[in-house]
């Protein structure tokens, strides 16, 4: 039985679905979705006010994700943005796939989770209630949990912490979470 389960993919992460082409890294739909929320044409590194001035460029590339320095004021060509974005997204999606074990997760759900993890970090997404529900087989509840607390009314993943340590709700972040939840369930 254990050998049969392994052959059927139960308990395995989703990297094998990527290897066989059942899930696509840096899909066109994901790249477009990321551009919607992270912006396009952001070629000059800026201090992101929502991230306490974290230097950010292109579609949300920061020093935490980039293999090259991200320095406020530097100019990145479109080609450099595309190259580094592809590396950053691929690396993030492979790490995300390691924590996803529900073989029913399809491209849309994977893309939604990829957007979430690109924004809040792979470790936070992997530790989220949403991923727990998705891995347990409840796709609908897991997708909803990207934007909402268990009560279905309280926004989640939609707050920033200011320099004084106070959490502040950001409507734009919640709009992104709602959009991710919608893509996730498609």
For every predicted segment, state its role:
Residues 74-129:
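Mid-length scaffold segments of soluble, non-membrane domains
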Residues 25, 29, 102, 108-110, ...:
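Alpha-helical protein-protein interaction elements
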Residues 54-59, 110:
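Small-residue-enriched, tightly packed secondary-structure blocks
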Residues 60, 67, 71, 114-117:
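Amphipathic, alpha-helical segments enriched in basic
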Residues 3-22, 29-52, 61-63, 68, ...:
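Long, amphipathic alpha-helical surface segments
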């Amino acid at each position: 039985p254990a050998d049969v389960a392994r052959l059927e993919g139960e308990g395995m992460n989703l990297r094998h679905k990527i290897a066989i082409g059942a899930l696509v890294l840096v899909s066109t739909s994901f790249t477009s979705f990321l551009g919607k929320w992270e912006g396009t044409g952001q070629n000059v590194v800026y201090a992101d006010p929502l991230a306490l001035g974290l230097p950010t460029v292109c579609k949300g590339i920061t020093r935490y994700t980039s293999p090259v320095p991200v320095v406020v004021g530097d100019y990145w060509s479109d080609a450099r943005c595309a190259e580094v974005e592809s590396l950053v997204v691929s690396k993030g999606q492979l790490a995300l796939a390691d924590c996803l074990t529900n073989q029913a997760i399809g491209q849309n759900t994977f893309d939604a989770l990829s957007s979430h993890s690109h924004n809040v970090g792979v470790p936070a997404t992997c530790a989220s209630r949403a991923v727990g529900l998705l891995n347990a087989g409840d796709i609908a509840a897991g997708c909803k949990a990207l934007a909402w607390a268990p009560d279905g009314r309280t926004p989640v993943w939609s707050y920033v912490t200011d320099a004084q340590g106070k959490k502040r709700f950001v409507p734009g972040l919640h709009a992104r979470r709602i959009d991710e939840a919608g893509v996730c369930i498609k």
